[in-house]
Amino acid sequence: KDGYLVNKSTGCKYSCIENINDSHCNEECISSIRKGSYGYCYKFYCYCIGMPDSTQVYPIPGKTCSTE
């Protein structure tokens, strides 16, 4: 599964700065929790490729992004 990393508690995407945080996004995507193949920063958010179907990506159905 491919998609944007999402914070399950806030429903928001993981933010990043393109060309600066690519390695951070990759580490998050290939972590033992998410088990993705590769990750990078795309349009200011971490995007992952090759994650298991069970891994939640943005958007979470029925949940909007809220940082409050």
UniProtKB/Swiss-Prot annotation:
One term under GO cellular component: extracellular region
Superkingdom of this protein's organism: Eukaryota
Domain LCN-type CS-alpha/beta: 1-66
Pfam family, one: Toxin_3
Entry's family note: Belongs to the long (4 C-C) scorpion toxin superfamily. Sodium channel inhibitor family.
Domain comment (free text): Has the structural arrangement of an alpha-helix connected to antiparallel beta-sheets by disulfide bonds (CS-alpha/beta).
Name listed for the protein in its UniProt record: Toxin Cg2
